[in-house]
């Protein structure tokens, strides 16, 4: 195992996504929240989110995470897949993570134009969000969450 692989394993071992919520960015109202560690690789996670989230112009995502390890440039790359085809890609950067810290990170996710939106009945169960967790260019973990609109 290379030093990079070992470093990625160390970071992942000490990393935990404690909770996450999604809010309507305009009203601040929480639409969904969960405490499952959605960063765990190797399993397909599931999230049941309300259909009305698709009507929001923007969604505010709040992540609370703990890290035993220091990270120089913690960042996420996310891809939204519909039936295996990538529809959207997002990039988020947190930056420096203090070792043995718990942090809350808020990000704004802008919705696709309404003309490009598919109905919840078509999307439900067919959307997977793939999240890659990085420390700068070092891939730490890849997780997948299947969305169900309820």
Swiss-Prot record:
Give yes or no: UniProt keyword Ubl conjugation.
no
**Keywords on this record?**
Cell projection, cGMP, Cytoplasm, Cytoplasmic vesicle, Cytoskeleton, Membrane, Sensory transduction, Vision
Tissue note:
Detected in retina photoreceptor cells, especially in rods (at protein level). Detected in retina, brain and adrenal gland.
Biological process, per Gene Ontology: visual perception
Highest taxon, organism lineage:
Eukaryota
Query: Where does the UniProt annotation locate this protein?
Result: Cytoplasm, Cytosol; Cytoplasmic vesicle membrane; Cytoplasm, Cytoskeleton, Cilium basal body
Principal localization? cytoplasm
| The protein's assembly and partners | Interacts with the prenylated catalytic subunits of PDE6, an oligomer composed of two catalytic chains (PDE6A and PDE6B) and two inhibitory chains (gamma); has no effect on enzyme activity but promotes the release of the prenylated enzyme from cell membrane. Interacts with prenylated GRK1 and GRK7. Interacts with prenylated INPP5E. Interacts with prenylated Ras family members, including HRAS, KRAS, NRAS, RAP2A, RAP2C and RHEB. Interacts with RAB13 (prenylated form); dissociates RAB13 from membranes.
What function does the entry list?
Answer: Promotes the release of prenylated target proteins from cellular membranes. Modulates the activity of prenylated or palmitoylated Ras family members by regulating their subcellular location. Required for normal ciliary targeting of farnesylated target proteins, such as INPP5E. Modulates the subcellular location of target proteins by acting as a GTP specific dissociation inhibitor (GDI). Required for RAB28 localization to the cone cell outer segments in the retina. Increases the affinity of ARL3 for GTP by several orders of magnitude.
Q: What protein is this chain from? A: Retinal rod rhodopsin-sensitive cGMP 3',5'-cyclic phosphodiesterase subunit delta
The upper taxonomy is: Eukaryota, Metazoa, Chordata, Craniata, Vertebrata
Supply the gene name. PDE6D
